[in-house]
């Protein structure tokens, strides 16, 4: 995997993936775009959400929406590393089985989500979920 990051102005940078997608990052507390740490947090949520939806769809569950609310704690002193991240999944569907959602969240956390599994080496990561009827 390859990517590049180019300075735009101030503390704003443009990241470009090898696949050609671009995203802005901002070091000024997210004034113009997400900060790099916000991007890491969202990457964990996106990676896990992809897994959960994919697992549920493969299990023939009728998923109509999936949202991940991420909360985190960081060290007060520099470097301001994450110390705890919680991923709370809100999965909406028709006749969704609670056990299927629990299994999908567990599989993502323990086996499939590369981002969260990498972060887990240094950060306490927890997962929770709720099932909402469509």
Swiss-Prot record:
Lineage top rank: taxon: Bacteria
Annotated Pfam families: OsmC
InterPro entries: KH_dom-like_a/b, OsmC/Ohr_fam, OsmC/Ohrsf
Gene3D superfamilies reported in the protein's UniProt record: 2.20.25.10, 3.30.300.20
Protein's name in the database: Protein YhfA
Provenance organism: Escherichia coli (strain K12)
